[in-house]
């Protein structure tokens, strides 16, 4: 049977299609297979390594100082790099980061609970720095690639949706299956009553090593199969080329309303959802006494995102990204309010009420999740529209920095709050007082509501690229680029 001829676009590239979407999804699956374990870091060091809440909270803040240096510098380095690589610039950086994730992911979960406080602190900081640097090396160029795969707004929205799908798939193993194998039931030896659950730290280490290896496989699939249709070496070199200025780029980012709005929404999402992970694990182990179900419950809560997948392009075409995502944030607000009820109802109703609130939250967040990365791609175009430079790597890396800052500061605050309500690390999850257990329930509910509020403010009030403005921006940018090509 004759092979179907390869269809090419007007520039000679393979036409955009399903292979691009699957490959791009595989990239975020790779990122999340390893870094999806981040939600387990605090639980591992708090419950298994028995690190004091105050010390762990401080260490989490310290490693964010590394983020402050790490993200923008790597983004600027990629923007300024004009060397020619066999795989291409972005794919080469992604490959290096993918290798580093195998080592770094395991390093942060070295199981030495008997070590002294100083050694524990050193192990935590070194392991986390290696892991975080590798993630940034892979994730910054990966995120920037969305605007290089296609220039079509609808196709970018599809890529953003598939990225979210890849992220969800990649997060399922560490987020859902891992809790089922790393917790063990603890019973009273005299009465046989179930007291709660304890963490099996050795299994976390081997799981992290395995996740890093699987992530590498996903990254290699993406590197080999995706096609970049926009020149990744678009920043010209030579005497007439504008010099790259990190300070100016940061100033432009702050003045870039779409980038700021999308970043605030993302920070809110991570401050709520990611921060809730530690309190959620402790709550499920101590309150519901079913920690192995925590990941499964989270999956059920966020499955509604998949409802929007087949319709996201139609929703975007009809209403616009901002308009559709804003409506979703209102539904998330309702879910957050419902979740405030579960600590007040009888135990028999607590889990169902929690689930209703979580499903509403996930349903509302579904649209935003599907288009969030396409919105950042639009923000990069906005940077070019308003300031004359795209600066993909820097805009994306600053967005990534603030996201990761939220991921780091949030858990640090949550751990400090757990200490404030009386959590005693040496008692694990089985010996905490009832006040601490109920306090963790209120903490989880409050974090989800806070997350929904931030998403509404970021997308509904700050992000200013509605459907009409986006069309105007795209038209003007296309005219500029056409004029520049004629001038050359």
Regions flagged by a language model, labelled:
Residues 2-488:
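Membrane-embedded alpha-helical bundles of multi-pass transporters/translocases
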């Amino acid at each position: 049977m004759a092979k179907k001829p390869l269809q090419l676009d007007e520039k000679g590239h393979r036409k955009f299609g399903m292979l691009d979407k699957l490959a791009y999804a595989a990239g975020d699956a790779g990122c999340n297979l390893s870094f999806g374990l981040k939600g387990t870091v605090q639980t591992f060091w708090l419950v298994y390594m028995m690190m004091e809440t105050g010390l762990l909270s401080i260490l989490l803040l310290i490693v964010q100082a590394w983020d402050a240096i790490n993200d923008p510098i790597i983004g600027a380095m990629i923007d300024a790099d004009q060397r020619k690589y066999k795989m291409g610039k972005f794919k080469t950086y992604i490959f290096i980061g993918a290798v580093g994730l195998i080592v770094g992911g395991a390093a942060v979960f070295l199981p030495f609970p008997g070590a002294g406080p100083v050694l524990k602190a050193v192990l935590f900081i070194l392991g986390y720095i290696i892991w975080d640097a590798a993630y940034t090396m892979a994730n910054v160029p990966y995120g920037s690639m969305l605007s290089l795969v296609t220039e079509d707004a609808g196709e970018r929205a599809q890529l953003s949706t598939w990225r979210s799908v890849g992220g969800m798939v990649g997060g399922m193993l560490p987020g859902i299956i891992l809790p089922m194998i790393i917790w063990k039931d603890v019973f009273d030896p005299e009465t046989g009553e179930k007291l709660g659950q304890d963490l099996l730290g050795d299994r976390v280490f081997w799981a992290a090593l395995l996740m890093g290896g699987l992530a590498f496989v996903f990254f290699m699939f993406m590197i080999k199969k995706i096609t970049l249709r926009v020149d990744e070496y678009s920043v010209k070199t030579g005497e007439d080329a504008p010099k790259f200025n990190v300070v100016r780029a940061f100033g432009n980012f702050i003045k870039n309303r779409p980038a700021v709005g999308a970043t605030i929404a993302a920070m809110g999402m991570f401050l709520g959802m990611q921060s809730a992970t530690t309190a959620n694990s402790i709550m499920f182990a101590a309150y519901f006494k079913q920690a192995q179900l925590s990941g499964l419950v989270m999956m059920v809560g966020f499955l509604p995102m998949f409802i929007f997948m087949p319709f996201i392009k139609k929703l975007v075409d009809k209403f616009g990204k901002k308009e559709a995502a804003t409506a979703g944030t209102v539904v998330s607000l309702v879910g957050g309010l419902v979740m405030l009820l579960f600590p007040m109802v009888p135990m028999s109703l607590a889990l169902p009420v929690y689930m209703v609130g979580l499903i509403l939250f996930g349903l509302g967040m579904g649209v935003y999740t599907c288009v969030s990365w396409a919105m950042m791609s639009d923000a990069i175009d906005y940077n070019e529209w308003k300031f004359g430079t795209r600066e993909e790597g820097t805009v994306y890396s600053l967005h990534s920095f603030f996201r990761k800052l939220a991921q780091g500061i949030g858990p640090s605050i949550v751990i400090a709050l757990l200490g404030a309500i009386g959590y005693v690390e040496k008692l694990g999850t089985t010996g905490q007082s009832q006040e601490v257990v109920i306090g963790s329930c209120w903490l989880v509910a409050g974090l989800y509501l806070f997350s929904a509020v931030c998403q509404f403010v970021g997308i509904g009030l700050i992000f200013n690229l509605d459907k009409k403005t986006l069309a105007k921006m795209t038209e003007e940018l296309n005219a500029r680029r056409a004029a520049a090509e004629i001038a050359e």
